[in-house]
């Protein structure tokens, strides 16, 4: 999980999800997991 000030989709399988006022990127590739913080 990477924590970044700005999250974005890296590939086509990445999807942006909003949970508890946090933006998350979830993907089949575990390297693409991101969280905004």
Curated annotation (Swiss-Prot):
Coiled-coil ranges per UniProt: none
Highest taxon of source: Eukaryota
Keyword entries, A-Z: Chloroplast, Plastid, Ribonucleoprotein, Ribosomal protein
Presence of the UniProt keyword Ribosomal protein in the record: yes
GO molecular function, one term: structural constituent of ribosome
Record GO cellular component, one term: chloroplast
InterPro entries: Ribosomal_bL36, Ribosomal_bL36_sp
Main location: plastid
Localization in the cell: Plastid, Chloroplast
Entry's Gene Ontology BP terms: translation
Ribonucleoprotein among keywords: yes
Family matches, as HAMAP family: Ribosomal_bL36
Protein family (similarity comment): Belongs to the bacterial ribosomal protein bL36 family.
Protein name: Large ribosomal subunit protein bL36c
Organism the protein comes from: Nephroselmis olivacea (Green alga)
Gene behind the chain: rpl36
